[in-house]
UniProtKB/Swiss-Prot annotation:
GO terms for molecular function: rRNA binding; structural constituent of ribosome. The keyword Chloroplast applies. Part of the 50S ribosomal subunit. InterPro entries: Ribosomal_bL28/bL31-like_sf, Ribosomal_bL31, Ribosomal_bL31_A, Ribosomal_bL31_sf. NCBIfam families: L31 (TIGR00105), PRK00528.1 (NF001809). Belongs to the bacterial ribosomal protein bL31 family. Type A subfamily. One of its GO terms (cellular component) is ribosome. Keywords: Chloroplast, Plastid, Ribonucleoprotein, Ribosomal protein, RNA-binding, rRNA-binding. This is Large ribosomal subunit protein bL31c. Its main location: plastid. One of its GO terms (biological process) is translation. It comes from the Eukaryota. It is found in: Plastid, Chloroplast. The lineage of its organism: Eukaryota, Haptista, Haptophyta, Prymnesiophyceae, Isochrysidales.
Amino acid sequence: MPKSAIHPDWYPNAKVYCDGQLVMKVGATKPTLNVDIWSGNHPFYTGSQTIIDTEGRVERFMRKYGMETQ
């Protein structure tokens, strides 16, 4: 016989909040979840991501180890 009452309660409509706003409902072991970042406000998914690369990694490596580029 399996042990009873060893599994956590399952909430099929757990509410996910981000900055106090309901963003989605999911299945979880807690009735409410609070997240800081989700796909609706993450820069990668919203298209507002900026890549700041003042010096390329290869060029920095070559300069650091004194290698000549050809």
